[in-house]
């Protein structure tokens, strides 16, 4: 073959080969397709030996180069990059091939090798020159092998630019000479390159030019500058190799290809020019280095492999030379496989104009009017955030839903965050990955920057965690793996998320994960290939040196906290925290403040669950590897493949994740359902502020560049447009959407909404930054966190935020709900409103994993408890596994309660969302306390409808059984003093588990009474009272809620058969039953304190039933306080079951007594059910829980366990709830009972921490009166233990139980007022106030002390007792006139006025005090006849809120029967003095029934009454009731009491009106009777 021919074959392009053994140039670069192959013969048919590559060209393998000696003339060393990346450095897209001199023709430049320049040879080298060069390269000696690096992804072997023809002579000397030439020239070329790169980066960096309007191009622009900077850095560090240049070129080509394929903007021309300039800058050093590192031997092998591939693949129809010529394009045929970019360049890399025009054409052809706000109709708010809000919008033309994120410009400008908004836009626009939320368009309005994103319906993982607790391992593995793939994609493009957390992991309608919220992300250097150069891991770990601490504290990596510089490993740290949270249910590190949390992150060891809760070994190893403090050794620092290869994913099919069926699939009531999201309106009010202010005229110019439209939007728009033409257009009212551009906006909006909907609107909002609102999340008061921070203070994460007060969550819908409440409720017969119906369904759907059906099943399992059987379980119920249900139940108890509260509010007057934004489930408190099916609860129509966010309604959030149809609220106008119905608490077990939630049913409706007239039906399940969900509320809370509503109460019910609750035989192991956690979570603080000492897991998984560790205690308090609302307001009632209540219910708070409670969130809520619940000990289930609860609280990391009230479920219900609305001044905390109930609940005395009185919210006068009376009784009974009441911290466990019983805070007002315990003298019988669930039954007249003889004043409760109990240090003045009962009054001192049920000091006779009768007292008086007479109908109690500070007293006949009244009688028998230390009252509740028809106090004797079975709660009607000892007014069900056999639905916490209270603390046998 002639040398001339081989020279002509300088452009040798190898086909791509499967093994990746050969590099293939990207099509965008024509030169990349060229291989420089200098052949010495023009005739392909000449003898092969003359060809440089005899083996390749020859047909026989024997001819391959390896069979030739290096000196063989036929042996030609092709410069091949040692790796498969060997390729020559003529860049097709560049105007010149490398030296900066233009090739004579761009065509030649692109089609021919630029070897001439590389070797500094004439444009047309002579044959002699080529021969000389051939000699130089004839030797097989390989130049230093730089092959250490990995091969570039596209293997494209190519000859080196200097591939001279072969000559028989030896060229070792010439090679040495040429290498010397290159080495000599390379430093100069390198220095020139570095200077040009520096100028290039400075001139074109994003900060120095206006941001590109197109998000994709803006991202690419950023990456090009990053690549230039990286090249400059590596050049200075001496790390540049040929392989590096290959990868750099590949990255640039990939970016350019993305620009052409994904952008329709004319700005592509700008990006193209940037790429060309950069390639020109690096071309000369690249070629010189390529020559220096050329390894002929390797190139031979590559060519041989290529030839073999061509033959095997039948790609070669002719002989090899012709094939090569054709492949090189020397036939001048167009390259079919070349990217159009080259064609557009039309043979000239120097003619970018063509690219521009073609690009322009494509963009213009698709050009539509830019998207604008007017193109979208705003449907509803999805969520609020620190910077703005996310709305569900619908494109007016296509009718497609999107999520529109609206960021307030002013906020961005004030915080200097404008650039970050562009970063988020660019990342979302550029990202194209199934696990990353996509953006469709962006635009600006006068007040906002809007991003339209895809709408992800299922809410976020944080909410899911709140609702169901720890995830099953398989579910956690799938979610984690999908997030790993999303992270791998982002890291490949240099994106560091910096705010990874469950809140930013959205769940799609198919149950898969999408990562969102890039508001805090950083764009670094893309790395599409694996870096093997020395020190790259260290460099990647220190990529950013801004020393900025941002993110969500619980997920911030140690290197960020220490301001050591950070990089991609920070995301892997967050992934470790997330996996731990998925599997354990809470984050591993907690703190009340960011500083405390950071201290733990840096120095503390991880606490691992043990025993049954222990994590799989591989999962624990994976978490430990991810949570390495040193980023250099952290798993993932070397790339995502390190994580993917871990044994935890041994059996995972990484390529088939999207094909796997998800365990949890959100269920949406409609396409506009956003119930899985928390609006967080209580925290942010962007909605109201949006268009009110004028924008600043001096806004930065770059903001005008924010509008963009992604190609995906154009595709969606065009396809949807066609569909939309056939659909009726029903524009949704656009709220705040000005009509701008319809087409582009929709999809992006959807995406934005989706992202925002997840945890919070924006990352920024969720993330913590100094100075920004996020920091508030860390504020000591959890309340702020509760209010809606996506990430609450460290320990108080959103998840834990479930503790948040319901009122906060309900706030957004409060008005709506309240309005509904105000409306006369529809008759119970009415089908539930569609909203209500939807809610249950959503709830079920929302919690795909936990099936409502299961909870339903549990509910059904207690048929005896529930009066009417529920017809069917939720069909979805079966979905969740029993284990998952149980875990969820646990989790929900904490978070679920909150959720329940949220939902009901919607129905009632407030949206009762999960207490924490995180808690997805909204429970229907009335219907299914916790025991119901959590999953089903979402089904409850109200819960779903009530919550704006589907989370609340999602089944996982709710324990309430699925309720297929809720009726409109039934408004019962009290006639006289009674409502005319009796309600009863039932336990609803979840599946076959021992976890139950408390639901309430209408047990009896009095004929001709107000309830019957209003349409209330016996057997209906009560879901909401005054718009507040009662699912999960203990009986006293519900009663309190009803009584505090005044003359009118709005009750929402659903036919039992419409629920998923099934009635079954009584549980024999009911003593093992555990009440499902309410959705309140324990404050993070408490959890934190115990964190080290107690098993974190126990807290989370087991105790989670009572509290969640995630949020700080402060949040609990806040929630309580927030839940406190005006006594009459539905919200006020809400607190009872609200998470706040749960908090109150904390055993500790119970111990603390009223005062402690006051300080506790529970106390803040005056009549919160929780407080009432605290008084009563639940049936045996609660018992069992009580010890656990105590331990859990202690173990919790929270600083002060006392601060965390038990969840309402944990508390025994107290009738107080039933009591009339507390006076405005009354606070939940004020009632002792409220606090005390937790103490009783626990079998072991809880640790009592006194709370400052100052912390106590004002109490309602009624509760105060009741409590003060209770205190009196306690002080009178001080002989037991120095008059320490449950309130006092020192109370012994038994006493504590007794006290618990004695506390009236949760009793109905009638009970509280009438139940002042008699003073115990040596011969005095202790009077036991019996309360009925439905009615206030107390042996005492409200105004009189039945046990005190006339004229005898009751001693004041000892101040010690008060203070110890936390009730009050000061003793309020009392009226102590003979004949009148001594009542404590508020005298400037907030103290809980509770009747003291404990034995008073011995020897003190009690006199009946007669005074003006309060409504409750009148009731008591009316129902009391002469002592010993039982059955005198009580005077109906008129429930009227008493004015604060005003006490009504009424004379009350005294019951002298020391053993207790067989019938509730007005008289309270004197109790014989009993040793305080030993005596404790066990409230046996056969069933909790509250008769709202005629409330009358039923005295209970401390001793076992002859008929302990007598249910105190018997309806006013003549419901058979055995005589039972009166229960001390405040007494709740004591742990150990047995629930009524056969009543599955009876709520253990509802021992509110247990029929039998035994002094010994053991359930009286009779009481256990039905």
UniProtKB/Swiss-Prot annotation:
- Biased composition regions of type Low complexity, renumbered to the chain: 105-114, 151-170, 864-878, 933-961, 1104-1132, 1149-1174, 1519-1535
Q: Which organism is it from?
A: Mus musculus
- Any GO MF annotation of the entry: ATP binding
Reported function: Microtubule-associated protein essential for correct brain development. Appears to link the dystrophin/utrophin network with microtubule filaments via the syntrophins. Phosphorylation of DMD or UTRN may modulate their affinities for associated proteins.
The AGC-kinase C-terminal domain covers 650-721
- Residue numbers of Phosphoserine PTMs: 90, 139, 167, 346, 689, 895, 954, 1414
GO CC field: axon; cytoplasm; cytoskeleton; dendrite; membrane; neuron projection; neuronal cell body; plasma membrane
Q: Tell me which EC number(s) this protein carries.
A: 2.7.11.1
Q: Name the chain's protein.
A: Microtubule-associated serine/threonine-protein kinase 1
Region labeled Disordered — which residues? 23-80, 94-117, 139-171, 341-377, 717-885, 892-911, 931-967, 1061-1186, 1202-1294, 1308-1570
Phenotype upon gene inactivation = Knockout mice do not show morphological defects.
Q: Kindly list the places in or outside the cell where this protein is found, as annotated in its UniProt entry.
A: Cell membrane; Cytoplasm, Cytoskeleton; Cell projection, Axon; Cell projection, Dendrite
- Disulfide bonds, which pairs? none
- Where does the record place the PDZ domain? 968-1056
Catalytic EC class? transferase
Q: Which Gene3D superfamilies match?
A: 2.30.42.10, MAST3 pre-PK domain-like, Phosphorylase Kinase, domain 1, Transferase(Phosphotransferase) domain 1
